[in-house]
Every structure is written in C-alpha cells, then in structure tokens.
From Swiss-Prot:
The keyword Ubl conjugation applies. Residues 1-210 are annotated as: Interaction with DPY30. The modification Asymmetric dimethylarginine is found at R109. It comes from Rattus norvegicus (Rat). This is A-kinase anchor protein 8. Anchoring protein that mediates the subcellular compartmentation of cAMP-dependent protein kinase (PKA type II). Acts as an anchor for a PKA-signaling complex onto mitotic chromosomes, which is required for maintenance of chromosomes in a condensed form throughout mitosis. Recruits condensin complex subunit NCAPD2 to chromosomes required for chromatin condensation; the function appears to be independent from PKA-anchoring. May help to deliver cyclin D/E to CDK4 to facilitate cell cycle progression. Required for cell cycle G2/M transition and histone deacetylation during mitosis. SUPFAM superfamilies: Porins (SSF56935). The modification Phosphoserine is found at S72, S199, S321, S326, S337, S659. The lineage of its organism: Eukaryota, Metazoa, Chordata, Craniata, Vertebrata.
Length: 687
C-alpha cells in the first residue's frame, strides 16, 4: 500500500452522483489509507469526481481515481485531494465554510467528525473555523455528527468507548493503531496548522474545573494532546513565512492561560509547547521612557544637557570653516564663558544662602518649641496646684468628693498595706497624714481663687458640630487595665467586668501598680524637707501645724528630672507667683507664658546694686529669690522657724561677700505688688 495520509478521504454517495453528496451508510466507507496525499490513488478504486481547492470553484474535475469498493459500480465521488494551492488562505477558508454550511443542512450520519456542525447549534459565529478532516478512528454506531471525537468534561452523551477526558496531558486514545498518534499529529499540524487559531495552543495547560476551553478550539477533531505537544502547528510552531490566518478564524473571546495572560500562543517558534507569548501582544507591551535607547550601539546612553563650554567651541569651529575667524569672536566667546562661570558661582552662593536660611529657620523652630514646652510645663504645674491628688496611688481629681472616697477606698488601703510590708508602720502613717494635709491645703487654695475671680464657663467641645455630621454625645468608661472605652450602659459594663480578659489584665495591673506605688513612696520620703517632717512626726510633734509652705513631692516628677540652676528656678517660681495660678486653671495660659518669656530673657546673675535704687525692693527680691531657690532645689527648707533663719543666713553672707546673687528685675512691679506676691509665695507650693 502506498504512502497514505490519514486526513482526507472520500464518501460514498450510493447511486451515481455528480454533486458530491454524502451517503449515510456505514458500510460504504472505504479505508482512508488508500488515499495518498502526494501520489495517485490505487487503480482498484473506482473513478470518482474529486473536488479541488483551486481558485476557480468547487466544480467537479475529470480526474479518475477509481472506485470506492471492489465490485461496486462506477460512481462519481467527491475527493478532497488538494491540488497545488495557489489561492490565499482567506479564499480557502471561505470555501471550507461553504462546505460546512452544506453539511449542516444535510445533517447525515456518516461518522463525520468535524466539530463545526456541533458548533453550528451552539453559536453560528463559530462556523468560521478551520476545517478539520475526519478522524482516523473506527466509526461507532452511536457516533453523531454533533459530537466531537474527543471529549471535554462537558455532559455529552458519551458512550462506553468515548470516555476519554480532556483534563490530562494526553487523551485516552481508542485508536487501534496508537503508534500513529505522533505522526498523525505532525502531518495534521503541517497540513492544517496554518489555518489554526493563534491562541488555541494554550489550552493544553488548562485545568478543567476552573478554566473553560477556548471556543475556537472546539471544532477541531484532532487529538489535542498531539497538536499541543507538537506546538499547535507542527513541531516548529508558527513561523513568520506563513500567511496570516483568516480574520474569521480568530477566537471571539480572549484566551487566557494558567499565567493569566491573554494569547499564550507561539512566539516566533522559539518557545516549546506553544507557551510563547502571542505576537499580537507585542504592541501591548509597556513602553518605558528611554527603553529603546539601550542597544549594541548605545548602551545605557542618557540624554544630557550640553555643557557650558560647548557653545564657544561650536562657534569657533563654524568660524574656521568659513575662514573669517577674528579676535573679536574669541573675545566674545571668552566673555560669554566668563559670564556663565560667574552665573554658576552666583547659583552656588544662592544655594549656600538658602541652606543658611534653612538652618536659621530650624533654630527658630527649636526656640519656638522650647518656649511651648515651658508654657505647657507651667500650665501643668499650675493645674496640679489646685488638683486633688494621691501621690502614692497616682490618683488625681478636681472634685473633693472623689478624693475623699479614694482615701477611704479599699484600693488605697491595700496600697498602703503593701507599702507597710516594705517600710515601717510609722512611716506609712506619716504618708497617709501627709496626703490628707496636702489635700486640705489644696481645698483652701481653691476657695481663695474662687473668691478672687469667678470661674469662667467651660467651652463646649461640640460647638459648631451640627446634625449633618452625625455626632452624638455619649458617656463612656475608660478601662485602664484593658485600655478600652466602654459605653456607660450597665449591661455592657457588667459584661466587661466579668470577662476573662479584664480579670486577667486587672490582676496584672494591680501587681504592677503596687510596685510603682512603693517606688513613689520611697521617692517622696527621700526628699530632705519630707525627711525633716518625718523626724518631727516620729518624735511625736505635729509637722503640719502652722507650716509656712506646702512642698509637695511627687516621686514620678522627681525621677529623671534634670537639675536646674538657681537662676532658672528663681525665674520659674516668680513666674508662677505672678500668674497667681488662676489664669492657668481657667485656660488662660498666655499671661503666664508672657511672664515666663520676660523672665527667661532677664535671668542670670545680677549684682544686688543693679537691681534698683530702692533698697527695700531689693531686699524683698533678694529674700524671695533665696527662699524659692532653696525650696525648689530638692526641698532643702526646714520648719517655719528654721526657714526664716536660713533666709537670713543666706542673705547676709551673700551681701557681705559681694558675690553675684540671682536677682530678677521685673519692670512695672510696685512695692505693694511685691508684698502681695511674697505673701502668696508662702502659701503656694512649688515643685
């Protein structure tokens, strides 16, 4: 038997027929191995009427290739042996589509395995697909022309012999000659691969449950494992010398591969298995600026501005070519170059000036921030003077009832009990008395301030917020242990109180709080002034009767605080005294800030003779400065009588020795105002 091609064949038409119709009898099939693709057919085959792919039409030719079967009468059949193809691919596709229309109208059962008829019922737009020959597998009685010979995972009425799946890399081939698979795939790829869709070759890497098969690949009856393994169009894949496919053969929907990219077809035939990128995607690549300049001739070349010296060189070269070079041109060029050099120096100087201005601005910002810190610190200290507080428990409140409840609470007593395990009982009792006495003095100070000036109404934080902002005023509780805000509802509060996380965090916070309270108590007792008071308390005396100054020492404020010079201490104390602690409490912190700024400017060691002509005023300032400096530096004052002696002893040696004493000269302060501030300083605690 001669060389055969398993792609084209002839169909019996029953009686003599010159129209090339197809018979429906299964027994009328002749093996397709008798038809040679390049040579004449066997003489045992009756004469038929072959249809050619010529450019004229589908008219029957006079070629005689023999009968279909032995003993049968001579008849005209349609042979699909292609003649030398001189037409372009579009005309061939049009003729194939015309034949497919004829087949879809007749609808005979001849085992025709072309998938174009099946696609005719689904979508008429897909009938413009490459025509595929009949598969060389044995015909089955239940085979219909609307079912392709291969199977997807769709719910077709598959027989027992057509249970192959498209999900694997290779199909479950039922061909009685499986060794012909690779060769048939190669021949089919060369014979019809030129009409195949560019994006079909990407379907072999799909997974069936998630990626639907391409619509353009359904009419093909060839085993997809063979076509895709060979690269979709044969072993070489697509090449540039082949004509482009027809416009109708392109896929109507974009084809996506497993990498999520459109059109993973062959790319110049260089990538195996058809995994290269589609050629239609080349113009979709992002074009970056300067990317095209990289090449063998210009590697990494960037666009540069012309340097300053190129302009006179160019002018000189042009003058040489013209032959009229003169000294004036050279002088002009030199002047231009000099001007450009001076311009460059000016730019450099300007940049330096800008850097200097930025540095000056940074210094101004630093000074401004430092002033703001001082204002905030003064405001906080002024607020602390009129705020009830328990230093050991770190409890603060502006309400007298709340501090009284705290001093009688279980939490406060447990804290003192824990401190008593580390310190003597008498010392713990002294701490309790000290806290109570301090809060009494704070209450007295608050009453005095309220008598002087009536409290200003508190500004409403919700002022200017309307209903269009959808704000609502609510009450909430802040859990310090869990750092959470809980709406003030009984059910929500109880739920949080009985939660496991809250109980765990509460126990941890209580342990940490006890350790902190012990540290604060030790810091308070380490103060020299408190030590003197503790000694009197242990002797049975009352250190809180007729006390000149109430010196509150907070452990957390003493820790890590930098030591200040006497001049700075005096300036801060005088500023606090002048503000009278009233304006800062009511939110008017600007006057205090102004006084602090004035004091900061004039602070420094000043001789007593330069303070003023009035000796009485200088004496008052001298006594006030020495007193406040000694009080603020770690609370070195003694009791009321000892404090007066200390002031006299400190003032006399300073005046006798003539050493510079820090005195602050504040203009605009009269003698009666100084006396008033001196009286207030005795009742105002400093920190």
């Amino acid at each position: 038997m001669e060389q055969s091609y398993g792609g084209y064949g002839a169909w019996s038409a029953g009686p003599a027929n010159t129209q090339g119709t197809y018979g429906s009898g299964v027994a009328s099939w002749q093996g397709y191995e008798n038809y040679s693709y390049y040579n004449a057919q066997n003489t045992s085959v009756p004469t038929g009427t072959p249809y050619s792919y010529g450019p004229a039409s589908w008219e029957a030719t006079k070629a005689s290739d023999g009968g279909l079967a032995a003993g049968s009468s001579a008849m005209h059949v349609a042979s699909f042996a292609p003649e030398p193809c001189t037409d372009n691919s579009d005309s061939l596709i049009a003729k194939i589509n015309q034949r497919l229309d004829m087949l879809s109208k007749e609808g005979g059962r001849g085992g025709i395995s072309s998938g174009g008829e099946g696609m005719q019922d689904r979508d008429s737009s897909f009938r413009f697909q490459p025509y595929e020959s009949y598969d060389s597998r044995p015909c089955m009685p239940e085979h219909t022309p609307y079912r392709p010979s291969y199977s997807y995972d769709y719910d077709f009425d598959l027989g027992t012999d057509r249970n192959g799946s498209f999900g694997g890399t290779f199909n479950d081939c039922r061909d009685p000659t499986p060794e012909r698979g690779a060769l048939d795939g190669f021949l089919r790829g060369r014979g019809q691969g030129r009409f195949q869709d560019r994006s079909n070759s990407s379907t072999f890497i799909r997974s069936d449950p998630f990626m639907p098969p391409s619509a353009s690949s359904e009419p093909l009856s060839t085993t997809w494992s063979e076509l895709n393994y060979m690269g979709g169009r044969g072993l070489g894949g697509p090449s540039t010398n082949r004509p482009p496919p027809s416009l109708f053969s392109q896929s109507m929907a974009p084809d996506y591969s497993m990498m999520g990219m459109q059109g993973v077809g062959g790319f110049g035939g260089t990538m195996p298995y058809g995994c290269g990128r589609s050629q239609t995607r080349i113009r979709d690549w992002p074009r970056r600026r300067g990317f095209e300049r990289f090449g063998p001739d210009n590697m990494g070349r960037k666009r540069k501005p012309f340097p300053l010296y190129e302009e006179p060189d160019a002018k000189l070269a042009r003058a040489d070519s013209e032959g009229d070079l003169s000294e004036n041109d050279d002088g002009a060029g030199d002047l231009r170059s000099g001007d450009e050099e001076f311009r460059g120096e000016d730019d450099l100087c300007d940049s330096r000036k800008q850097r200097g201005e930025k540095e000056d601005e940074d210094e101004d910002v630093k000074k401004r921030r430092e002033k703001q810190r001082r204002r905030d610190r003064m405001r906080d200290r002024a607020a602390d003077r009129i705020q009830f507080a328990c230093s050991v428990c770190k409890f603060r409140s502006f309400e007298d009832e709340e501090i009284q409840k705290h001093l009688q609470s279980k939490f406060h007593k447990e804290t003192l009990r824990f401190i008593s395990t580390k310190l003597p009982d008498k010392t713990v009792e002294f701490l309790q008395e000290y806290i109570i006495n301090r809060n009494k003095k704070i209450e007295k100070r608050r009453q005095e301030l309220l008598e002087k000036e009536s409290p200003k109404p508190k500004p409403d934080p919700f002022k200017g917020i309307g209903q269009e902002h959808f704000f609502k005023r609510i009450e909430a509780a802040h859990c310090l242990a869990c750092d959470m805000l809980i709406p003030a509802q009984h059910q929500l509060l109880q739920r949080h109180l009985h939660s496991v996380d809250h109980n765990h965090n509460r126990r941890l916070a209580a342990e940490q709080f006890k350790k902190t309270s012990l540290h604060v108590a030790k810091s308070v007792l380490n103060n020299k002034h408190i030590v003197k008071m503790l000694e009197k308390y242990l002797k049975g005396e009352d250190p809180f009767v007729n006390e000149t100054a109430d010196l509150e020492t907070e452990g957390d404020e003493n820790l890590g605080e930098e030591k200040e010079t006497p001049e700075e201490v005096a300036a801060e104390v005088l500023a606090e005294v002048i503000t009278a602690a009233v304006k800062a409490v009511e939110g008017d912190g600007e006057p205090a800030a102004e006084h602090s700024d004035v004091l900061a400017e004039v602070e420094g060691p000043v001789d007593t003779a330069e303070a003023g002509s009035d000796s009485h005023t200088g004496k008052l300032l001298e006594e006030q400065t020495c007193e406040t400096a000694s009080e603020t530096r770690n609370m070195e004052d003694m009791a009321r009588g000892e404090a007066a002696e200390a002031r006299n002893e400190a003032a006399v040696p300073a005046a006798a020795a003539g050493s510079p004493v820090p005195v602050i000269a504040i203009p605009g302060i009269l003698e009666d105002e100084l006396e008033q501030t001196d009286a207030e300083a005795k009742d105002t605690p400093t920190e």
